[in-house]
Amino acid sequence: MARVKRGVTTRARHKKVIKLAKGYRGRSKNCYRVALQRVEKALQYAYRDRRNRKRFFRSLWIMRINAAVRQYGLLYSDFIYGLSLANITLNRKILADMAVHNKDNFKQIVDLTKEALTKSRVG
């Protein structure tokens, strides 16, 4: 059986890691063993933060909606409940965008939710 020399695959694997470590400081950019540790940790951070980004943006949208709704005398929780009563199915991302960029349309939605809330409390 022929002898298998592993230099080609090792070099390719090392090049791949060094390429991922481009832009790092010190030995992290050109020393394979250090670069491998740094790249693995960077990938862990990336995996974690892809999930954290979703949480962060949802909380940001909620803060923006809450701030915009309080200008019209409503609480965030009442506003969300009023949306469900009024059968308005806009998500928080769209509502937050409207609160920042389309204040007139957002005011109309707030008025609709106020009407739905008063109807539910009266009848």
Curated annotation (Swiss-Prot):
SUPFAM superfamilies listed in its UniProt record: Ribosomal protein L20 (SSF74731)
Keyword entries, A-Z: Ribonucleoprotein, Ribosomal protein, RNA-binding, rRNA-binding
Source organism, top-level taxon: Bacteria
GO MF entries: rRNA binding; structural constituent of ribosome
GO cellular component: ribonucleoprotein complex; ribosome
InterPro entries: Ribosomal_bL20, RIBOSOMAL_L20_CS, Ribosomal_protein_bL20_C
UniProt keyword Ubl conjugation, yes or no: no
GO biological process, one term: translation
Function according to Swiss-Prot or TrEMBL: Binds directly to 23S ribosomal RNA and is necessary for the in vitro assembly process of the 50S ribosomal subunit. It is not involved in the protein synthesizing functions of that subunit.
PANTHER family documented for this protein: 39S RIBOSOMAL PROTEIN L20
Family: Belongs to the bacterial ribosomal protein bL20 family.
Name the record gives this protein: Large ribosomal subunit protein bL20
Lineage: Bacteria, Pseudomonadati, Pseudomonadota, Alphaproteobacteria, Rickettsiales
